[in-house]
Amino acid sequence: MDTHLPFQTLPVSTPLPVSSSSLTDVLQTIAALQACPTSCIPSTSTGMLSPNLPFSATIPRVNLFPPSQPANSLILPTIPAQPFIPNPSLLQANPSAVEALANALFATTSRRASCPEPPASSQATVTLQVPSTGSPERRRYSETNMEVLLREQLAQLMPPTSQLPGMPGCYYQHVPAAGTSGIQGSLDAALMGAVPLAMNSMAHSRRAANHRKARTIYGTTQTQQLEDMFKGQMYVVGAERENLAQRLGLSPSQVRIWFQNRRSKHRRKQQEEQQSTTLEEKSEEIGKDEEEDDEEDEDDVKVLN
């Protein structure tokens, strides 16, 4: 048997009824709002706008998602829409208020056009790039030229001279120079930390240079008496050393050092004498060998003859 299914009708969406007068009112309201944007109003409070620019108390509501209807229903419900009632007071505002808004908008636009954007260095955090302690770059920098390194890095972060404070219509006249003060503070702090390091290093090197004691200069009489004492005995210790130092007007340590140096000099002299004697002996032996060779050659010549 042939079965016939009943014809089911689907709901058809119809466009919302919109009048041309409501569209005109909406366009006029949008044009009025674009002519006087809220961004150019000095204050964001709506209390200042209520005397001259009152807004509508009712907000239009449009139901874009109607409730579903049964599939076999042929009656399409109409969506009620409240017409938008324009507020004529927006277009008939007080002339003084409109003039004030226009002046504020013109001042804001002219300031943005004449003033350049703030440099990135005034908003960024200043970071001094100092090489690490163990790196080879740090070895090339001593404490004395740390100031030069800091000034080179800060010169790259400072704005050019054309954007320095004092120029008309510049960003730095309206915004306090917080970035410049921060950079100056960082420079002062870095220099305050680098100067003591340089002073400490200089003092340390000066102490190392002064650590070596001055050489004692002995007088002629002192040297002669010490030489006479050294010829008699090469080692002077104990009470004898103290008595000798007291007699010569020296300290026991000075006497001890003089004898040490004199013994070293004596040993070097002995070594030089030994070397010289060995060289003389070798030269004498070589001379004797040559004479013997000459005599043997003469004897050989006589035998041949």
Curated annotation (Swiss-Prot):
- Which InterPro entries does the record cross-reference, listed alphabetically? EMX-VAX-Noto_Homeobox_TFs (IPR050877), HD (IPR001356), Homeobox_CS (IPR017970), Homeodomain-like_sf (IPR009057), HTH_motif (IPR000047)
Spell out the Polar residues composition-biased ranges: 120-135
Keyword presence, 4Fe-4S? no
The record's subcellular location field reads: Nucleus
- Bilayer-crossing regions: none
Instruction: Identify the keywords attached in UniProt to this record, alphabetized.
Output: Developmental protein, DNA-binding, Homeobox, Neurogenesis, Nucleus, Transcription, Transcription regulation
- Give this protein's Gene Ontology molecular function annotations: DNA-binding transcription factor activity, RNA polymerase II-specific; RNA polymerase II cis-regulatory region sequence-specific DNA binding
Q: What are the record's GO terms for cellular component?
A: nucleus
Provide the residue ranges listed under DNA-binding region in this record: 211-270
Q: Which terms does the UniProt entry file under GO BP?
A: cell differentiation; determination of adult lifespan; negative regulation of gene expression; neuron differentiation; positive regulation of gene expression; positive regulation of transcription by RNA polymerase II; regulation of transcription by RNA polymerase II
Where does the record place the region Disordered? Answer: 113-140, 262-305
One Pfam family this sequence matches: Homeodomain
CDD domains from the UniProt entry: homeodomain
Keyword Acetylation recorded: no
Compositionally biased region (Acidic residues): 287-305
Show the SUPFAM superfamilies listed in the entry.
Answer: Homeodomain-like (SSF46689)
What the record says about disrupting the gene is: Viable and display no obvious neuroanatomical, morphological or locomotory abnormalities. Lifespan reduced in an isp-1 or nuo-6 mutant background and extends lifespan in the short-lived gas-1 and mev-1 mutants. Expression of the G protein-coupled receptor sra-11 is normal in AIY neurons at the larval L1 stage, but drastically reduced in adults. RNAi-mediated knockdown reduces lifespan in various mitochondrial mutant backgrounds, including isp-1;ctb-1, or clk-1.
**Protein family (similarity comment):** Belongs to the distal-less homeobox family.
Q: What does this protein do?
A: Probable transcription factor. Required for differentiation of AIY interneurons, acting downstream of LIM/homeobox protein ttx-3. Modulates gene expression, acting downstream of AMP kinase aak-2/AMPK signaling. Modulates lifespan.
Descriptive protein name: Homeobox protein ceh-23
